[in-house]
């Protein structure tokens, strides 16, 4: 992963440098098209590794021992060990406002059969949630009103195998305002998080914009970083504006932010709630 991050990185920064080295943390902004491309190239060129595209229906069990996985087409792939990298796909539901649709992430289906299968084997499950911000068209942003934010002067790679990395793109910074917060509050009654529609627990250090407004009501603004998602795309990630509020509220809120007054939304923000299995069940 470190090698792939170094190879596809657009900007590299060390976080928390105002404090002691023990909490310094490397961060990279990566090209969303190049990273998976390089990952595929690596996997497909790895010896003794076979990559199969298929949907898994259940884990095959024989006399309380794993025998492999069974696909939706009925094919069994034999194995003495199975590692599930489920992400947000197990019984995933995507929310924008009060509308929920099945999905692991935008434009991709969720997996329901694996959760049922593991529950039938005696595993216990819970629900988690995370979210993502809107993406906007770079050509609709007024960059003249924004401050530019670059990477480190001497960026450090993640992998010891990488001799050096360089910053390719800069980001741009703006902030929300009290007007933005008032607009977003109008949609709180249709927030799946505040209404109880989403019961899953969210990430501790990456709250949604509505959560930040609610929890830190004394703050009159919150930082927004506009990050281009790749060298060959005009899609810009609105970092700091993760939300599951209704589309009209998202649009009105974004248009109240300096530099985004005329922004065109390419994809709306959404939350995803999904199953996870308690880690203390691992042996």
Residue ranges and their predicted role:
Residues 1-58, 85-105, 109, 113-115, ...:
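Conserved N-terminal/central alpha/beta ligand/cofactor-binding core
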Residues 2, 8-12, 212-213, 224, ...:
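Flexible, glycine-rich loop/tail regions that form catalytic "lids" or insertion modules at the edges
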Residues 25-29, 104-108, 170-174, 199, ...:
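Hydrophobic alpha-helical scaffolding
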Residues 59-65, 71-75:
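A conserved hydrophobic secondary-structure block that centers on an alpha-helix together
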Residues 70-81, 86:
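Core beta-strand elements of the Rossmann-like FAD/NAD(P) dinucleotide-binding domain
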Residues 131-138, 185-186, 196-208, 266-279:
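Flavin (FAD/FMN) cofactor-binding core of flavoprotein oxidoreductases
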Residues 147-230:
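Long, low-complexity segments enriched in small/aliphatic residues
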Residues 237-283:
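A glycine-rich dinucleotide-binding beta-alpha-beta segment and adjacent secondary-structure elements
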